[in-house]
Structure formats: structure tokens, C-alpha cells
């Protein structure tokens, strides 16, 4: 069974750095990459049709980000990732995905180059850090391409 590196992607630069790291790591270890994008539900909107339109717009934006990022890693690492788009709470989406896949070797998250590392990094390295069935790899968002290549 191939090792799968799970990357949670959003529109942040550090998420794209984490994706490039995971792609290079997977290519070097004959592994695979799962790209998980999460569409978060909007706060209550009085009209259901408006809420559905807002969520669909967010979904299309995230799918565009994923498509652009996937193009980068396909050309750089020569692998085709599995793309999963889920709706809901990001923490629950990550746990749900990992819970359905026995081949996830690591959760790969990008940390912001400065300030708060991001909500998923904070969650999965905080109070519940020991509850995942796989390690968490935190990739600094400030790494250069050369550093990514060396470390992967």
C-alpha cells in the first residue's frame, strides 16, 4: 500500500508550500498525495437560496485554487493527487478524511511564516495532538524551493 500524504489546501501561500513539500516527498517515496479543500458553511443567512449561492461561490473559488495548485505539483513532481472537497468544519473534515483512509501516512500542514500558524496547525498540535492515527508534518511557509527539495 502506497503512503499517502494528506494536505489541506486553502488560498494561503503556506498551504501551497505544504503541497509542494508533500508532492516532492511522495515522488521520492513512491507515495501519493490527497488534497483536501474544505468549504466552510456560512454564518446564518436568512434566505436559504442566498446562503446556497454564497457557499457555491466559495466552493468554486476553492476548486479553482486546488486546480491551480494541482497543476503546479503535477509538473514539479510528476504525480496526480486525489482531490477531495468537503463541506463543513475544517477540523471535522480532516478527521473524517483520515478516518476513511488507512493509507494516510501523514497530515501535512503549512504554517504561516510569522504570527499565528493557522487554525489547523494550532488545533492538531495543541490539546488533541495525540489523537490522530498519523503524524502531523508542519511545513514552514517561509521555506524556499531549494529548502523544500532538500528537506523532502
Sequence positions of predicted segments:
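Active-site phosphate/pyrophosphate- and oxyanion-stabilizing loops and adjacent acidic/basic residues
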Residues: 23, 71, 96, 126
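General small-molecule cofactor/ligand-binding pocket signal
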Residues: 34-36, 82-86, 137-139
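Small/aliphatic-rich secondary-structure junction motif
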Residues: 2-49, 131-134
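Structural beta-alpha unit
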Residues: 75-107, 150-152
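Glycine-rich, Arg-bearing micro-motifs that act as flexible, cationic patches
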Residues: 106-132, 143-149
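Short, solvent-exposed amphipathic alpha-helices that sit
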Residues: 21, 58-69, 93
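Short, well-ordered secondary-structure micro-motifs
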Residues: 18, 45-48, 95-96, 119-120, ...
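Acidic, proline/glycine-rich short linear motifs
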Residues: 37-64, 146-152
